[in-house]
Amino acid sequence: MSLDTTEKQQLINTHQTHGTDTGSAEVQVAMLSERINRLSRHLQNNIHDFSSRQGLLKMIGRRKRLLSYMRSKSEQRYADTIAKLGIRG
């Protein structure tokens, strides 16, 4: 369920706002979204894995808080991130 270094670096390069950006809200949301997608696929096959389900809900909450923060700071960055990741319909 975790991301290896090449996948993580690829996500960072795709979503970074400047050359040395590794921890902006956009990058964090992108990494959380990828982990959420992987864990969701895992839970479809392993229905009774309740501890992973709890971790999934925590990640969803963290992503929701980050998106709320982004929306309060810059509506345009929020909209761009949502569109790029394809979340929230």
Swiss-Prot record:
Q: Does the keyword Ribonucleoprotein apply?
A: yes
Q: Where is this region: Disordered?
A: 1-25
Q: Which GO terms describe its cellular component?
A: cytosolic small ribosomal subunit
**GO annotations under biological process?**
translation
User: Which PROSITE patterns does the entry link to?
Assistant: RIBOSOMAL_S15
Question: Which spans does this entry mark as compositional bias, Polar residues?
Answer: 8-25
GO MF entries? rRNA binding; structural constituent of ribosome
Q: Does the keyword Zinc apply?
A: no
| Keywords from the UniProt entry | Ribonucleoprotein, Ribosomal protein, RNA-binding, rRNA-binding
**Protein family (similarity comment):** Belongs to the universal ribosomal protein uS15 family.
Q: Which HAMAP family match?
A: Ribosomal_uS15_B
> What does this gene product do?
One of the primary rRNA binding proteins, it binds directly to 16S rRNA where it helps nucleate assembly of the platform of the 30S subunit by binding and bridging several RNA helices of the 16S rRNA.
On assembly, the entry states:
Part of the 30S ribosomal subunit. Forms a bridge to the 50S subunit in the 70S ribosome, contacting the 23S rRNA.
Protein name per UniProt: Small ribosomal subunit protein uS15
Species annotation: Synechococcus sp. (strain CC9605)
